[in-house]
Amino acid sequence: MEVLTMNGYTIAIVGAGLVGERLVSELRRREFPIQELRVLARSARTVEMAGEAFEVGVAEPDAFEGVDFAFFAGTEGEKGAAVQLASEAISRGAVVIDNGSDFRLDDEVPLIVPEVNEDALENHNGLIANANCSTTQMVVTLAPLAKAFGLRKVVVSTYQAVSGSGRGGVEALEDGRDDVYPKQIAGNAIPLIGSIGDDGLSTEERKMVLESRKILSLPGLEVHATTVRIPVHTGHAESIYVEVGRDVELAEVLEVFGSAPGIVFSGEADDFPTPLEAAGESGTFVGRIRVEGNVINYWCVSDNLLKGAATNAVQIAESLVKARV
């Protein structure tokens, strides 16, 4: 892909919600080279995103003419923008980076977390999937453990912010909107994200199991997840239990986390980062590290709208620019 001009790339962001807004701010913050930035949605309108006013265009095939990178951050499913329009964007020369779940498990589509499997970008055919928010922060922490010690089993419980449900989730917490969650979210914890399948797993739990195996290239990895929505605005937290391939010492684990890409770690095993501290930051924070034999327990938090969505997507584009693939 040799689309860089003297002035940068033409970017399209499909979706003007929370993730779309964070994409604008991350592209600016990370100084991604932009010649033109288009915001597209179902209907034309003027919106303010990241402190800028944008004339939103209609997301339709011709809107992708001349686009180099198209970030999809809108509705998922059969009627979603990516399913309807990703192929149209690709046929016009764009590389599509999709934040939704529609293509993540497609064998022909790389599912990317750059700190973990950037090399998988070599095989893309114009469409790249951004991982689920809760999966992303987990695999950022699992990958260095896998490299150092090997992985046998993972058990994770999540505590996920309402912004993971979009503006509707925020409104449910702040204004009492009652059509977003199956039970009241304010002052509560809901151990159901998505719907429950025949296997007893929720939609979110299944994503974590299947996506982590694909990203880590460990198709047989034993992963057990329980995902919970909590009344926090931004920032997902996870309690993770890992069985590794050999007995380890605490000092070894601290060294691994302290040198791993994408991880923010104070160096103190007893440190306890919280969603409030992670909000607005692009890294994955780790703390409460405990070791017994071949078992490692730890806590991680990350901004679900940044590393869990927008930052990871922009990192993918940066990787493509660097590699020219």
Residue positions per predicted region:
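Charged docking surfaces used in two-component/phosphorelay signaling
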Residues: 70, 162-325
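N-terminal Rossmann-like NAD(P) cofactor-binding subdomain of oxidoreductases
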Residues: 2-185, 221-222, 278-280, 284-285, ...
